[in-house]
Amino acid sequence: MIDVIKRQIFSRRSVMGSVFSTVMLLAGTTTAALASEPVGFGAGTTGGAGGEVVDVSTPAELKNALCQRYQGYTCIDDTPRIIRLNTVIDFTATQGTTSTTGCVYADRQCAEPSGKQERVLDNGSYCSGRTTFPLTYDNAAKSLLSVGSNKTLIGLGASAGIKGTGLSMTGGVSNIIVRNLSITDLNEGIVFGGDAISIDNASRIWIDHNAFARIGRQMIVTGWGPAKAVTISNNMFDGETAYGHYCNGRSSWIMLLIGEAEEITLLANHFHATAGRSPEIGTGGMIHLVNNLYTSNFYFGATASRDVNLLAEGNYFNPEGQYFFPVASTPGDLVFAPLDENVSSTGSLCSQTLGRSCVTSYTETGQESFLLDTTVMSNIAGNATWKNAIGSVRPMMSNDVAKSVAANAGPRADPDSVSR
């Protein structure tokens, strides 16, 4: 049923033309995944509240509303502003194309009907020793829109969005909200063809109720600068693609979180038809992966690290028969991921650290990689910001996640329509 819903919503010729109709009322829980304010690390983010309300409908209007003042290439526009879209703003072909060279980076050759061949731009050494060929990409997808501090970008209704380019938050910008939009079609099938959202040295960010599909590089990327006080909630990450690293119609380029000292809550998102990087983490900091739904996934879900703390709780993994490791980890990685099968060994550690019990995730595959490294909990206990942000989230049980997240992730007619 979930696959049918996704095909209806993410048609390859239109962007978010319908809205989920099922509403789950989660009585008795206080997880604010669907509320009008962020919880977790991004709590307190207000965006453009109190500022001018600007309605935009063209590429030029949107670019100007997001940032009106620059210092060099850095946006320094910190004027509070609420920017509203009620349509899809298409940047495709607005900046022309570039013809260059590329190669096939994967070790396998894809052919119809299993999937078109994924290509990579000839950047760095990626095409070293490989056969190169002419490759043309759309420039707008690699020229992201700069977002200034104190901005809210929100779609009115379920059919608003940005096509053909993404958003960049860098240079120390802070207090930004991106809600209820689709961001799609950035050089699909061309690796390094553009990111949907890039966060590099930015803080206090809430990315909520958006949908991402057919992105050339990452749907969300952080790094190498800090990405602090970030909550990513209620989003649909749809990996269905005509291309694919593994020739199976699933994207491997979903979310790469490699910001310095990052602090990110990933709450109630839907990762569908992915084949890795959901997310991949590195560099340093804390990631709270909570109440996310995974469907029809292949190979890796979250990829752990020895440098970043990962607390994974209350997630629901349903790869639908695919070869899949929900949490890719090895001993020594900083992972604390309780399951029903191992949670008894933690004793009172969660309640002592967080002021509440940890919530177990559900999976039928890869259970051996759900580590319980108590170093993660010690690190949380020793960091007041982490302890408060994680402890403030009240996860729902994993058996409620599938219906709730499938019904509510992505853009909606009213993103605040579901109450607790």
Task: Go through each PLM region and give its residues.
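N-terminal secretory signal peptides that target proteins for export/translocation
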Residues: 1-11
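Bacterial N-terminal signal peptides
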Residues: 17-29
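Acidic Gly/Asp/Thr-rich repetitive segments characteristic of extracellular carbohydrate-active
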Residues: 34-82
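Acidic glycine-/aspartate-rich tracts in secreted/extracellular proteins
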Residues: 60, 88-91, 158-159
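Extracellular beta-strand-rich solenoid/capping regions of secreted or surface-exposed proteins
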Residues: 67-78, 93-152, 161-179, 185-202
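Right-handed parallel beta-helix
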Residues: 149-159, 174-185, 203-217, 227-247, ...
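Extracellular beta-rich repeat passengers
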Residues: 281-283, 288-420
